[in-house]
Amino acid sequence: MTRSLKKGPFVDHHLVAKADKAVTTKDKKPIKTWSRRSMVLPEFIGLTIAVHNGKQHVPVYITDQMVGHKLGEFALTRTFKGHPADKKVQKK
C-alpha cells in the first residue's frame, strides 16, 4: 500500500536541515544518514547522500529520476556471493 497523498512525503527533519545547509553553503561533501526511510525530495537533486546499508555508508548521487523514491532503495543491504559449487558434478 502506498502512502496517502494528503499526508505528504516523509523525510527526517535532520536530513532536510543538512540538505538546506549544504545547498546554501554549496558544500560538496556527502551527507551521512542512517535514514533509509526518508523520501528523496526535489531539493536533494545534485547532492551526494551517504546512505547506511548496515555496514557502511554508500554514496548516492541524487538525480531527478530518483525523486519520490526512498533512500534505502539505492543502498543495497544484501550481497549475493553465488551458490556453492556442487562437488558431485565433475566438469568434462
From Swiss-Prot:
Gene Ontology CC annotation, any one: small ribosomal subunit
UniProt KW rRNA-binding keyword: yes
UniProt cross-references to PROSITE patterns, sorted A to Z: RIBOSOMAL_S19
Gene Ontology MF annotations: rRNA binding; structural constituent of ribosome
Highest taxon in the source lineage: Bacteria
A Pfam family: Ribosomal_S19
InterPro entries according to UniProt: Ribosomal_uS19 (IPR002222), Ribosomal_uS19_bac-type (IPR005732), Ribosomal_uS19_CS (IPR020934), Ribosomal_uS19_SF (IPR023575)
Gene3D superfamilies linked to this entry: 30s Ribosomal Protein S19, Chain A
Signal peptide: none
Keywords: Ribonucleoprotein, Ribosomal protein, RNA-binding, rRNA-binding
One Gene Ontology term from the biological process aspect of the record: translation
Family the UniProt entry places it in: Belongs to the universal ribosomal protein uS19 family.
PANTHER family listed in its UniProt record: RIBOSOMAL PROTEIN S19P FAMILY MEMBER, SMALL RIBOSOMAL SUBUNIT PROTEIN US19M
Described purpose of this protein according to its UniProt entry: Protein S19 forms a complex with S13 that binds strongly to the 16S ribosomal RNA.
Matches recorded under HAMAP family: Ribosomal_uS19 (MF_00531)
Protein's name in the database: Small ribosomal subunit protein uS19
Species: Variovorax paradoxus (strain S110)
